[in-house]
From Swiss-Prot:
CDD domains: PseudoU_synth_EcTruA
Assembly information from the UniProt record: Homodimer.
The organism's place on the tree of life at top rank: Bacteria
UniProt name for this protein: tRNA pseudouridine synthase A
Residues forming the catalytic site: 54
Role this protein plays: Formation of pseudouridine at positions 38, 39 and 40 in the anticodon stem and loop of transfer RNAs.
Organism: Tropheryma whipplei (strain TW08/27)
Length: 267
């Protein structure tokens, strides 16, 4: 049977979700969307996501695609999904559009952008930040963290910052790693890469926190990076302060080429 592919852009507050992936008995982002789609369509669809997020991680723009036999009008589909999910106030379907068959939410993507929010002892702590900001009980040195971040940018083996895995490469192209202290004292870590390994963002920011507090030297950090093996010296920060900002894609005529390139790298 012929199917029509749809691209769904989604935003969510991850505080009360057990991640994205549908799991029996657990409240997940993908599970709620899948349940809504099952009420709309006769066939049980599969959802392909651009960037899988762990429990507690938020998203301003997550992207997924789904293939449907029923081929509903995308405007109707958007309104129907929003109606079915209206009681889920921490989840919102931003858009629903028909996509070409060679669009792939994961493999067509050329970039993922994240921000991790931290506050240190320089600034006052407000309880309402507890779901979105990581609190560090130390004075962090911004200039040291910026030097560390600039030294990590580029095409490298990020095995030191990735959850150990038997299969697949840990080579990634980190294009952006900025450390910006906001007027209210929060420190925002902005990262962009072609892709990120599991826990890679939280480990990268964790390494900078250790550098900023003086617990890790720049020399040691770059040595661990070169060795490309996980070390307890680089902590994994909690997920609640991490937000997926968005997913970037090439122009439509480049989808097929990008799909092939990504599959060769990641599978």
């Amino acid at each position: 049977m012929n199917k029509t592919r749809y691209r769904l852009d989604v935003a969510y507050d991850g505080a009360n979700f057990c991640g994205w992936a549908p799991q029996p008995g657990l409240r997940t982002v993908g599970g709620l969307i899948l349940d809504a789609l099952r009420l709309i369509c006769s066939e049980p669809p599969d959802i392909v996501i651009a960037a899988r997020t762990d429990a507690g991680v938020h998203a301003l723009q997550q992207v997924c695609h789904v293939d449907l036999i029923s081929s509903p009008d995308p405007v109707w589909l958007l309104h129907r999904l929003r109606s079915l999910l209206k009681s889920e106030t921490d989840l919102h379907i931003l858009s629903a559009v028909k996509a070409p068959v060679n669009f792939h939410a994961r493999f067509s993507a050329i970039g993922r952008r994240y921000v991790y929010r931290v506050i240190d002892k320089r600034s006052s702590w407000y309880p309402q930040n507890r779901y979105f900001v990581y609190r560090v009980n130390a004075f962090l040195q911004d200039y040291r963290m910026r030097r560390a971040a600039s030294g990590l940018i580029g095409l490298k083996d990020f095995g030191a910052f990735c959850k150990p895995r038997r299969m697949g490469s840990t080579v990634r192209h980190l294009r952006q790693f900025e450390v910006i202290r906001q007027p209210d004292g929060q420190i925002h870590f902005f990262l962009e890469s072609d892709a990120f390994c599991h826990s890679m963002v939280r480990n990268l920011v964790g390494s900078l926190i250790e550098v900023g507090r003086g617990a890790l030297t720049l020399q040691d950090l770059f040595c661990y990076t070169k060795i490309a093996k996980r070390t307890p010296k680089i902590p994994t920060l909690p997920p609640h302060a991490l937000t997926l900002i968005g997913i970037d894609y090439p122009q439509e005529h480049l989808f097929e080429c990008q799909n092939r390139k990504t599959r060769q790298k990641r599978t």
